[in-house]
UniProtKB/Swiss-Prot annotation:
InterPro entries: Asn/Gln-tRNA_amidoTrfase_suB/E, Asn/Gln-tRNA_Trfase_suB/E_cat, Asn/Gln_amidotransferase, Asn/Gln_tRNA_amidoTrase-B-like, GatB, GatB_C_1, GatB_Yqey_C_2, Gln-tRNA_amidoTrfase_suB_CS. It holds the Pfam family GatB_N. This is Aspartyl/glutamyl-tRNA(Asn/Gln) amidotransferase subunit B. GO terms for biological process: glutaminyl-tRNAGln biosynthesis via transamidation; translation. It is an enzyme of class 6 (ligase). Its EC number is 6.3.5.-. It comes from Campylobacter hominis (strain ATCC BAA-381 / DSM 21671 / CCUG 45161 / LMG 19568 / NCTC 13146 / CH001A). PANTHER family: GLUTAMYL-TRNA GLN AMIDOTRANSFERASE SUBUNIT B MITOCHONDRIAL AND PROKARYOTIC PET112-RELATED, GLUTAMYL-TRNA(GLN) AMIDOTRANSFERASE SUBUNIT B, MITOCHONDRIAL. It catalyses: L-glutamyl-tRNA(Gln) + L-glutamine + ATP + H2O = L-glutaminyl-tRNA(Gln) + L-glutamate + ADP + phosphate + H(+); L-aspartyl-tRNA(Asn) + L-glutamine + ATP + H2O = L-asparaginyl-tRNA(Asn) + L-glutamate + ADP + phosphate + 2 H(+). The gene is gatB. Keywords: ATP-binding, Ligase, Nucleotide-binding, Protein biosynthesis. Heterotrimer of A, B and C subunits.
Length: 473
């Protein structure tokens, strides 16, 4: 039996308007090499100037994970050569990072588990290489984008735990609004460090790094494959031959890993303090300001339970992502009843999102959902009819709620005179049951409601039917 040891390094792009050491914009998806300057290109004489906003966002993250904020930290040069790194070194923090000794908690099988965060340090992103047949192209728009590298302790023991940690971390970054953490665009990238050891053994064996994973699914699959590969090598007596300290790439076509290069030790990067940048000194005022972070996911959950009366399971679904929570908050801020919001967000809308779609991808936004809930609350349509409206809008996103109600003829009848005429007819047809009801057979009330709704072809407002029936009976 073997135990898996997993540690994660997450590179998170901070959502500052400009790069970490110059004033070039950080926008994504523009034409190649338009957001560059002498500093990005490492032209002689160009000097870096630290972006204060990036420092503030790093402090916010440290606060969110209960970490130590170093009031003095330094930038170092990490020396290596690659085409997308014009200076032939990366400005990073090695000796004294801005954030150390944090933690977050994940829920595994109903149990909370603490995952330590060793450090989080600021650094600049590299450019992007695109490889074509016979040539490689370099785009330096991304070069200099501020990164926060978040390094965990090797506290995870399975792919499930690693994914739970990443989802929790991703959620925190989004909720405190320091990164869009868009995995498809590369603003939330993960390196996985994996090793195995016999159960009960305290020794740490050879660690393999799997580079640049950009989806939770790929993290899970990469860990599963790599653990199986290392166990097979051990059991075949080839562990020292096949499992070496190296960086491996994950092949998304067949869910396997393959060797990329030998893994460097820190000494090989020849770190030394960057002489162009002063020591970062954080004032008490800046520290106090940066620590005023937005409400964290768990804090939202407690508020939803204690103040809005939500069930724990419902609250946990809502805080599962920033987009889900924002959608819910939009509905609450529009004045809708919390439990109605839960039903229509967690059950009705979620249930209609298929093929891996999330609330963020939903064709119906919070404003349109608010319109739908308003029509339920004011009695214009029944909840049953509202489901038809939602189904129609999911396929025809440009149409308004009121237009769908009109088009499908779903508006409820709430006119007293119309409903009373039907009630009188039902009572006249069922005089025996009326007598039984008035003699104490209360359960017959449901019968009368059903008969009135049937005669009204489901178009009557149920609340109004109940109210008028009670008066008549």
């Amino acid at each position: 039996m073997f135990e898996t040891i997993i540690g994660l390094e997450v590179h998170c792009q901070l959502n500052t308007k400009t790069k970490i050491f110059c004033s070039c914009p950080t926008s994504f998806g523009d034409k190649a090499n338009v957001h560059v300057c002498p500093t990005c290109l490492a032209l002689p004489g160009a000097l870096p100037v630290l972006n204060k906003e990036a420092v503030k966002k790093a402090i916010m993250f440290g606060t969110a994970v209960n970490a130590t904020i170093n009031k003095k930290s330094v930038f170092d040069r990490k020396n290596y050569f690659y085409p997308d790194l014009p200076k032939a070194y990366q400005i990073s923090q090695f000796t004294i990072p801005i954030v150390e000794h944090g933690e977050l908690f994940i829920n595994i099988n109903g149990e909370n588990k603490r995952i330590g965060i060793t450090r989080a340090h600021l650094e600049e992103d590299a450019g992007k290489n695109t490889h074509e047949e016979g040539r490689s192209l370099v785009d330096l728009n991304r070069a200099g984008t501020p990164l926060l590298e978040i390094v965990s302790e090797p506290d995870m023991r399975s792919g499930d735990e690693a994914v739970a940690y990443l989802k929790k971390l991703h959620s925190i970054l989004r909720f405190i609004n320091i990164s869009d953490a868009n995995m498809q665009e590369g603003s939330f990238r993960c390196d996985v460090n994996v090793s195995i050891r016999p159960k009960g053994d305290e020794k740490l064996y050879t660690r393999v790094e799997i580079k640049n994973l950009n989806s939770f699914k790929f993290v899970q699959k990469a860990i599963e494959y790599e653990v199986a590969r290392q166990i097979d090598a051990w059991e075949d007596g080839k562990y020292s031959e096949l499992v070496v300290q190296e960086t491996r790439l994950f092949d998304t076509s067949n869910f396997t890993t393959r060797s990329m290069r030998s893994k460097e030790d820190s000494a090989e990067y020849r770190y030394f303090p960057d002489p162009d940048l002063l020591t970062v000194e954080i004032s008490d005022e800046m520290l106090e300001e940066a620590r005023k972070i937005p409400e964290l996911p768990n804090e939202k959950k407690e508020r939803y339970i204690n103040e809005l009366g939500l069930k724990k399971d419902d609250a946990e679904v809502i805080i599962s992502s920033y987009e889900h929570a924002k959608f819910f908050e939009d509905l609450i801020n529009a004045g809708h009843e919390p439990k109605l919001c839960v039903t229509w967000l967690n059950v009705e809308l979620n249930g209609r999102l298929k093929n891996g779609l999330t609330i963020e991808d939903s064709p119906i936004d919070s404003a349109k959902m608010s319109d739908l809930l308003s029509r339920i609350e004011d009695g214009t349509i029944s909840q049953k009819a509202a489901k038809e409206v939602l189904d129609f809008i999911m396929e025809n996103i440009e149409i308004s709620v009121d237009d769908v109600i009109k088009k499908l003829g779903l508006k409820q009848v709430s006119d007293d005179a119309t409903i009373l005429a039907v009630i009188d007819a039902v009572i006249s047809k069922n005089e025996q049951k009326v007598a039984e009801y008035r003699n104490g057979k209360d359960k017959l009330f449901g019968f009368f409601v059903g008969q009135v709704m049937k005669e009204g072809k489901g178009a009557f407002n149920p609340a109004k039917v109940n109210e008028l029936l009670k008066q008549k009976l």
